[in-house]
Structures are given as structure tokens and as C-alpha cells.
Design a protein with these regions (language model features):
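Short loop/turn segments that connect beta-strands within beta-propeller blades
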Residues: 32-36, 81-85, 125-129, 180-184
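A short beta-strand motif characteristic of beta-propeller blades
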Residues: 37-42, 86-91, 131-135, 187-191
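CBM-like carbohydrate-recognition segments
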Residues: 181-184, 189, 198-204, 214
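Conserved beta-propeller blade repeats
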Residues: 1-10, 44-59, 92-112, 138-156, ...
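Feature marks short, surface-exposed loop/turn motifs that line or immediately flank catalytic pockets
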Residues: 7, 18, 56, 67, ...
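Acidic, proline/glycine-rich low-complexity intrinsically disordered segments
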Residues: 1-18, 31-34, 38-39, 44, ...
Length: 221
């Protein structure tokens, strides 16, 4: 769930309550922060919310889509107006695309994708142009989160070979990496036992000086 920039609305992705036949779907809804009737923006299919644009006009999400003439499911980065409207998929069907997040100035969308082989952090303009790979080392990198001051990006790294590139599981040794907004000065911040859930959402402090993360405690007998 993500609050709107003005804190008046709440966006969530969840299973529609009317599905009682065992079918699984995930729709994106918007409702008043104080409660009320939710508005279904995406309709049938699998849509997983990740970002709300700083101007409050759009939502960005990971969408599983398949046209009638297609044999396999596409995992795309899509956007939709926050008050409802046409879905626009910004990626081109290449690879597994996930984790879209707007930059603080709203000019870019950061996401991760296997389009180059391993999972890597990418950046594109808000309209889908200017696609740029931001990490390129021999590991699987997920969930690039931009600091509020727009200077740094934190991301989660899984070692190559331990998982398929499109997998991010819990209970694993992983690391947090950081780079400048332009992709320079990459460095490891720390190693931890965690994985899925460690930094799935942007958890930078408002002053950009610290970041919260989840690690798991190892119990030795």
C-alpha cells in the first residue's frame, strides 16, 4: 500500500473480495485515506503496486499481461492515472520487469529487469524512453530505491547461481549496495541474512542519511 503524495488517498494491490472460486488475481485500488469505497483501477489480471508519482497523477506497477495471440505471459512495467483511465505499459516484453519506483523529481522510473540476462537495476524516463542499465556486475540486483535528495540509490544483491535471475527468496545471504544517481561509485554497504522483504519498498529516512531494512536472526542450536 502507498499513500498519495498529499496523504489524501491510499493505493493498494490485493485480491478482489468477489473472487471466491479459487481464482487468484491482484488488482490495484485507490480509496480515501480515511476509508470509503475503493476504486478498482486495473481490473482482471495480476497487477502489483510499487510507486506513486510525486505529482500524484500516476501509479506504477508490475503487470502480468498476455494477449490472445501470445503464448507466454509478459511481465511489464505499466502506469495508470491515479483517478482511473488507460493502462500504459512502458517496457517491451523483454525479460522479467519488476519493482518500478519514481524518482523524487518524477522524471525517471527505476526498476529491475532480466532483459540483459541477470536481474539488474534499470532506469527510464517517465514515458518509457531513455532506457538505461544502471548495474552491470555479475550478480542479481533488485529494487533500486532513490534517496529523497535524489543523490543515491540503494539496491539488494543476490549472488549469481544461488537462484534463477527472476527469483528473490527469503532466508538467504544477500548484500545491500549503493550507487550515485548516475550509476557511479557503486559500493557494498553491508552483508546480511535476509532476501525477499529486506528492502522491497523505499525506506530511506526523510533526510536521506539512513535507510531501514529487514534482516533475519539466525538461531544456532
Amino acid at each position: 500500500h502507498i499513500p498519495s503524495p498529499d496523504n489524501q488517498l491510499l493505493a493498494v494491490s490485493c485480491m478482489p473480495p468477489e473472487l471466491t472460486d479459487g481464482t487468484y488475481e491482484s488488482h490495484i485500488y485507490v480509496l480515501p485515506m480515511t476509508g470509503g469505497e475503493p476504486k478498482d483501477l486495473t481490473g482482471p489480471g495480476l497487477s502489483y503496486l510499487h510507486g506513486w508519482s510525486p505529482d500524484g497523477k500516476e501509479l506504477a506497477y508490475c503487470a502480468f499481461r498476455k494477449k490472445p495471440e501470445e503464448e507466454t505471459m509478459r511481465i511489464e512495467i505499466c502506469t495508470i492515472p491515479s483517478d482511473g483511465g488507460e493502462e500504459i505499459c512502458l517496457t517491451d516484453g523483454k525479460g522479467y520487469n519488476d519493482g518500478p519506483e519514481y524518482s523524487p523529481d518524477g522524471k525517471h522510473i527505476w526498476f529491475n529487469s532480466t532483459r540483459s540476462g541477470l536481474m539488474q537495476v534499470w532506469r527510464m524516463n517517465r514515458d518509457g524512453s531513455g532506457l538505461t542499465q544502471m548495474t552491470d556486475f555479475d550478480a542479481n540486483n533488485w529494487f533500486g530505491h532513490v534517496s529523497p535528495d535524489g543523490k543515491h540509490v540503494i539496491y539488494l544483491t543476490f549472488a549469481k547461481g544461488e537462484l534463477e535471475p527472476n527469483e528473490h527468496l527469503p532466508n538467504m545471504y544477500v548484500s545491500l549496495g549503493m550507487m550515485d544517481y548516475d550509476g557511479q561509485n557503486k559500493k557494498k554497504v553491508l552483508d546480511l541474512f535476509g532476501g525477499q522483504g529486506s528492502i522491497n519498498v523505499n525506506s530511506w529516512a526523510p533526510d536521506s542519511r539512513r535507510i531501514a531494512y529487514v534482516k533475519y536472526v539466525l538461531h544456532h542450536k
